[in-house]
Amino acid sequence: MSKGKYVAYVSSYTQGDSHGIRIYDVDMKNGRFKEKDKVEITNSSYLTISHNGKFLYSITDFGVEAYTIMPDGDLELINFAPINGMRGCYVSTDYTDQYLFVAGYHDGKLTVLRLKEDGSIEEIT
């Protein structure tokens, strides 16, 4: 993304529409959002961006999906990782982007997954 340009990522539940992430160009001068793309994902209940700004991670009904953030702000799917049936409600990376933390909504548990340098999610640690 070029300096001075902003992109917003909005996650949502999907009922009748399979696009759970919407990507918006942000016009800071006029305070407007313009939808530029949408991503097919089921019930993207929460998302986070890695500390290095290169990757986006989203919780789904079935686990966590990893995306590369392209120079124009679009997203490219890297991979998916299951979280053993846990229904995640929060996702975050550590400061070095080596681990992904997923907090459980119903059970209050925390699942930790290892991350590779390319942003892909490995198995639960």
Predicted segments, located by residue:
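An edge-strand/N-cap motif at the start of beta-rich repeat modules
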Residues: M1-G16, I23-D25
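Short glycine/acidic-enriched loop and turn motifs that connect beta-strands
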Residues: Y13-D17, G63-V64, H106-K109
